[in-house]
A protein has these predicted regions:
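A conserved beta-strand element that flanks and buttresses the S-adenosyl-L-methionine
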Residues: 117
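Local beta-strand N-terminus motif with an aromatic residue
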Residues: 53, 113-114
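Short catalytic micro-motifs in class I SAM-dependent methyltransferases
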Residues: 120-124
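Class I (Rossmann-like) S-adenosyl-L-methionine-dependent methyltransferase catalytic domain
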Residues: 2-108, 129, 136, 144-287
Length: 287
């Protein structure tokens, strides 16, 4: 492949990631952070089993939920989203060690850290070459013998509400609907007593009742039609609002065994692997 062609492909991939990853996470950061508060067990165990005094990095740390798991180790967190880094600062006013940094261009020294974690991040790079390069870059920061724990969304999510499964497209745009801060007006129930079931003709002279009933029926039909039109307009407005509040994030859904292949291609040695929370994970050691 020519250098120019490779540069063009990288440029296209970067544009896609900017549009469907970086911009989106900055837009949804506060809402996203509210849904990311419970640490996953295997990540927690990985961190708790590190020797006291170990130093590591969390690449794509989000709101920093893993940074305080083990008080006896030191972790520097980074994320491409300045919005999520702000959330990390807000969640820990005393201050996490976090910074805004691209996962492909980490400012840390090479061969320095005892371990790394990157949870649900690598799948956002939009080509295999870039995903392998991202893993390689993470490993470059870890000393020889150090380990990195990497999680990526799985293609095989048969028991998940998302319903992804083997045979489906692996490169997908996943919707995220922002919460509308404005309270939606509640629609009136159709049967709320607004319309009379029968006209009151007690005070109407007998000879005028037929005309009175006919007029009453017309008025009721007009009111009913007006309410139906109003409900439809309200429904269309809500759909437009939801469409405006829906943001799409790019994901590569990893099939079983694929993450291990990428870690090996990145120069690592697979120590163990598994499945948790609709994600494949790999612990990869730097030779």
């Amino acid at each position: 492949m020519s250098v120019l062609r490779l540069e063009h492909q990288n440029s296209m991939a970067e544009s896609k990631e900017d549009e469907y990853v970086h911009k989106v996470y900055n837009e949804i950061a506060p809402h996203f952070s509210q849904t990311r508060y419970k640490p996953w067990p295997i990540v927690t165990d990985f961190l708790l089993n590190k020797p006291s005094g170990s130093i590591g990095i969390d690449v794509g740390c989000g709101n920093g939920k893993y940074l305080g798991i083990n008080p006896d180790i030191f972790i520097i967190g980074s994320d491409r989203s300045s919005g999520l880094i702000e959330c990390a600062h807000e969640l820990n006013p005393k201050g996490y060690n976090v910074l805004v940094a691209d996962g492909m261009h980490l400012p840390h020294p090479n061969n320095r850290f005892d371990f790394a974690i990157s949870i649900a991040v690598v799948h956002h790079w939009s080509t295999r070459e870039r995903r392998i390069e991202a893993i390689k870059h993470i490993l470059s920061k870890v000393r020889s013998g150090g380990e990195a724990l990497i999680y990526c969304w799985a293609l095989e999510q048969g028991n998940s509400r998302r319903g992804y499964h083997e045979g489906m497209e692996q490169d997908v745009l996943v919707p995220w609907v922002l919460q509308d801060k404005k309270k939606k007006p509640q629609r009136q129930a159709k049967k709320n007593g607004k319309f009379q079931e029968k006209p009151d003709v007690a005070s109407v002279p007998p000879q005028e009742r037929a005309a009175f009933i006919a007029k009453w029926k017309r008025e009721q039909e007009e009111k009913k039609l007006a309410e139906e039109i109003n409900e439809e307009l309200q429904r269309q407005k809500e759909l437009e609002e939801e469409k405006k509040n829906t943001k799409y994030r790019y994901y590569h859904l990893y099939r079983e065994g694929e993450l291990e292949e990428d870690c090996i291609q990145a120069g690592g040695e697979v120590v163990r692997n598994g499945y948790e929370k609709d994600n494949w994970y790999v612990v990869v050691r730097k030779p």
